[in-house]
């Protein structure tokens, strides 16, 4: 028999508290046969089939056997409470090596490309000048109190710019009247489409902003970056891009964004 959204979600939420990793509950609507995540589905939806899922790996490592056991217990409780049959996609014995494989993938391809923009010696950057330069470069202030260059097709951030401070965030006060001791542009390589092109665009923005502000592109130790270093990073990104595709996971895909 079909199950209401609230009935399924109530059982799921009662037992999901034992889990640390990201998990989700999806259902197939009746009528309509559309798969929706119950957490965001309309309250009056009714579902014929349910899928409970758990993320098995990410950049922090693989799921443990005890976590998988708790996940199995959650699905058993749901099956019993909702009086529904149950089928696992794989056993714990099959899931553990698959989780390790995904974890190794995350470790192998976890790459953050970072470029620092430093001010002239003994000086800082004027907040209002930074805001104007970034606006002209097409970057917008947004998530996590940082600037982002958004993809107009997807609305997702292609790369970001942070304050060169411990927190990394920027405040409206700093941008309106403050001084900044440096800027950091960064790109989470596996999570964007066409990472090589995106890094090239990041370098273009970094050069533009640096020129506008009278700054210089530097490494984390404040040494001036040479062309050879950009080439080295670009080569590393191209290699990662092709390796990910050989692995069967495209950079910027939904699967890549879940893992990274």
Language-model features, listed with the residues they occupy:
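Charge-rich interaction surfaces and accessory domains that mediate macromolecular binding and assembly
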Residues: 1-60, 64-73, 77-109, 212-260
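Membrane-proximal, solvent-exposed terminal domains/tails of membrane-associated proteins
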Residues: 88-89, 99-102, 106-125, 132-260
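Glycine-rich, acidic/polar active-site loops that bind/position phosphate-bearing ligands
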Residues: 62-72, 124, 128-131, 135-136
């Amino acid at each position: 028999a079909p199950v209401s959204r609230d009935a399924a979600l109530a059982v799921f939420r009662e037992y999901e508290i034992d889990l640390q990793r990201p998990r989700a509950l999806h259902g197939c609507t009746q009528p309509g046969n559309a798969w929706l995540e119950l957490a965001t589905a309309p309250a009056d939806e009714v579902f014929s089939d349910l899928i409970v899922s758990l993320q098995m790996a990410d950049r922090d490592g693989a799921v443990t056997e005890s976590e998988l056991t708790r996940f199995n217990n959650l699905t058993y409780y749901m099956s019993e409470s909702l009086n529904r049959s149950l089928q696992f996609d794989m056993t714990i014995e099959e899931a553990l090596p698959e989780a390790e494989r995904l974890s190794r993938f995350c470790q192998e391809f976890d790459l953050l490309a970072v470029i620092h923009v430093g001010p002239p010696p003994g000086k800082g950057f004027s907040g209002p000048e930074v805001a104007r330069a970034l606006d002209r470069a097409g970057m917008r202030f947004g998530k996590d109190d940082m600037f982002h260059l958004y993809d107009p097709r997807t609305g997702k951030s292609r790369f970001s710019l942070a304050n060169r401070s411990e927190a990394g965030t920027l405040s409206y006060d700093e941008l309106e009247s403050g001084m900044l001791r440096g800027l950091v542009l960064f790109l989470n390589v596996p999570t964007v489409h066409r990472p090589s092109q995106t890094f090239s665009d990041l370098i273009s923005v970094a050069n533009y902003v640096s020129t506008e502000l009278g700054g210089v592109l530097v490494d984390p130790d404040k040494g001036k970056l040479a062309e050879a270093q950009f080439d080295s990073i670009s080569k590393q990104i191209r290699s990662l891009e092709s390796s990910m595709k050989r692995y069967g996971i495209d950079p910027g895909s939904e699967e890549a964004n879940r893992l990274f």
